[in-house]
Amino acid sequence: MTNIQSILIANRGEIALRVIRTARAMGIRTVAVYSDADASSPHVRAADVAVRLGPAPASESYLSVPALLAAAREAGADAVHPGYGFLSENAGFAEACHAAGLTFIGPPAEVISALGRKDAARELAEQADVPVLRSYRADEVPGDVFPVLVKAASGGGGKGMRIVREPEALAEALSAAEREAESAFGDGTLLVERYLEHGRHVEVQILADSHGTVVHLGERDCSVQRRHQKVVEESPAPTISADLRERLLDAAVRLCRKVGYVNAGTVEYIVSGEEFFFLEVNTRLQVEHSVTELVTGLDLVELQIRVARGERLPQLSARSDGHAVEVRVYAEDAAHGFLPQAGTADVVRWPAETAALRVDTALRSGGEVTAYYDPMVAKVTAHGVDREDARRNLLGALADTEISGLTTNLPFLRTLLASAEFADAGIDTSWLDTHPDLPFHPRLEPDGPTPFDAQDGWRLGGPRLPARAAAERTGVRGAASAEADGSVRAPMPGTVLAVKAQPGQRVVAGEPLGVLEAMKMEHTLTAPHDGLVTEVGAAVGDQVPLGRLLFHVQAEASS
């Protein structure tokens, strides 16, 4: 039996707080780590000890294995919990922890290595008789198999992933996906698979101990996605038959037994009708583990720690009690392609937690969301006796949530959960991409100018009084921008990856002008209207701040 008395959490934000909460309940000392950008973050104050890693960039802090190992030595930790993201699925980090005499709270390094790459995991799935989608070499994709999905062999989270519908678009998609994967994971290797247009994303929660016991804790449906990243997750999956459920649960256990899996993990599938196909294995705790915890009554972090100690798993029931739905609250602009946002949240108000409502967050009033890390700021999860009860509970919780001063997807989430499509469980993985306007009310024609449009204020009698207010979009889009000046500015700090337009070039509305990388994702900058490019304000490789003028398009005079 391994003695674990002090855990270093190699992560930040809400997952660090989540691990601290369970460790403290188990009487285990906790060690937080932080970058300069996170020096005053809640997880730093919540831990028993906190150690600085380095500057704000993740490569110099949360992704620095030497810095993390040095922090563990300095704080006297004897175990490391990786959380999710960052180094959580890095076999080299797990091996380095083992070599340093630290217990890694996750699968063995060799298992992470075997399953961490999608191409290797695919081969193992085939050996375990788990169905897989047909794949192709990037230079040998037949013209009659489109659409196809290009995805990174390493990592996840939608990075390095592109849907390609026509053969002529494949080369550019491969180039962009390779750049993004190399930046996010240090590995630009890609896979190309047949893309299922209206599939559902269903995954199985696995738990295994070092004594040969492998169990599943039911499945989750994660089909509501944007940019190939999950937005809403729920358990149990609402649309699959009992027979399909049994087959995909059995396949997940079979695969994990074959590879000698230990600790918590998730086997992900794409489901179409009564068929299911293997996607990948996430060798870590998932963001959406909270829905499983609410329907099973289990603490997955506690079970992770007990397994890492060498304990046998207790008798666990996979029976679901009711239904749970989780939403991810992101600092992003849903009205403009879910573009990540950075800034300060002036006022933050979360709903009160109850037995049926859980809020996982590190964002407080005055908290800052930086461009250095993932823009997820919270998870809000509701439980109910059935799916409709859980949905209504979650809608009520979101109505009681307020974030002012920072653009978030809260209005979008409220509209989405209230939609008939979500209530009827009719949303598949492509829904948000193929129905970009459905989460919003119909577009409204702009009104004429009014005094309220004045940017410097106006007064109609009465005394002048100071006031401050925060506005929140209700989900209504305007049909046009009456005063668009043609300026295309950097929506957040980032690196210019491509410049596709030059001064003097005529462009049409929506035509790509350039590509900006921010938060490890590529964002295509497009022309706001038909016109002539009169200015290009950056070159490839430039680091640009928020608001930097990158392009200017002079509108063509209407005839």
What are these language model-derived features?
Residues 1-267, 271-286:
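N-terminal beta-alpha lobe that positions the nucleotide/phosphoryl donor
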Residues 83, 187-193, 261-267, 313-320, ...:
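Flexible, glycine/charged-enriched surface loops at secondary-structure junctions
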Residues 210-211, 245-276, 346, 353-401:
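Long hydrophobic segments that form regular secondary structure
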